[in-house]
């Protein structure tokens, strides 16, 4: 069944500037700037009215309804990112061969994973900071998508194939996600 009219107002928090050009949204706040392009989505209107962002569509089927609420979630994540930021925690796990992880330019280098001689590399997305502290890796940034993708890149680069995962648990795993400055964790 189609929803005849979907309308949502998102309050713009204080200290945040929003610029909307067509389906491109640019959000600027105290921690930085995020820009997202929703031009691949048709039939949904995004506009700024006073101190609110209005997202609106008509005759929405299941797909358009999902896109509508996804746009709203992206905008709210952008607001959180430019005011607080996001942080992911990863744990380096090894049993016999000590794994060495270091940040070099725009990549994370993983050495000696299960005794391998080759260096595994994971790409760091732009605008994301990666810190290695002992057996923990901390990934921080404003854009939740880039922070999550960087953490996933590190996790995938350390994935071991050809071994029983129940026996060989060596690798790097995400164990905590949080909004910087809040106690809420996922």
Swiss-Prot record:
Metal-binding is among the record's keywords: no
A GO cellular component annotation in the UniProt record: cytosolic large ribosomal subunit
Keywords noted in UniProt: Ribonucleoprotein, Ribosomal protein, RNA-binding, rRNA-binding
SUPFAM superfamilies recorded: Ribosomal protein L6
Pfam family for this entry, one: Ribosomal_L6
Database matches in InterPro entries: Ribosomal_uL6-like, Ribosomal_uL6-like_a/b-dom_sf, Ribosomal_uL6_a/b-dom, Ribosomal_uL6_arc, Ribosomal_uL6_CS2
GO biological process, one term: cytoplasmic translation
KW Oxidoreductase (keyword) present: no
One term of GO molecular function: structural constituent of ribosome
Domain of life of the source: Archaea
Position of the signal peptide: none
Family, similarity comment: Belongs to the universal ribosomal protein uL6 family.
Quaternary structure and partners: Part of the 50S ribosomal subunit.
Function: This protein binds to the 23S rRNA, and is important in its secondary structure. It is located near the subunit interface in the base of the L7/L12 stalk, and near the tRNA binding site of the peptidyltransferase center.
Protein name, entry field: Large ribosomal subunit protein uL6
Name of the encoding gene: rpl6
């Amino acid at each position: 069944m189609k929803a005849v009219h979907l309308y949502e107002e998102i309050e713009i928090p204080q200290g945040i500037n929003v610029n909307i050009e067509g389906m491109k949204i640019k959000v600027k706040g105290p921690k930085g700037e995020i820009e997202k392009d929703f031009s691949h989505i048709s039939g949904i209107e995004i506009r700024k009215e006073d101190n609110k962002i209005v997202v609106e569509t008509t005759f929405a089927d299941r797909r358009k309804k999902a896109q509508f609420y996804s746009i709203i979630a992206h905008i709210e994540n952008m607001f959180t990112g430019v005011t607080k930021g996001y942080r992911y925690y990863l744990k380096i796990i090894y049993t016999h061969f000590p794994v060495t992880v270091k940040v070099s330019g725009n990549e994370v280098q993983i050495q000696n994973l299960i005794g391998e001689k080759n260096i595994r590399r994971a790409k760091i997305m732009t605008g994301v900071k990666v810190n290695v502290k002992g057996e923990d890796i901390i990934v921080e940034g404003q854009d939740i998508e880039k922070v999550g993708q960087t953490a996933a890149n590190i996790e995938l680069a350390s994935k071991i194939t050809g071994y029983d995962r129940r026996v060989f648990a060596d690798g790097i795993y995400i164990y905590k996600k949080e909004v910087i400055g809040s106690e809420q964790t996922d």
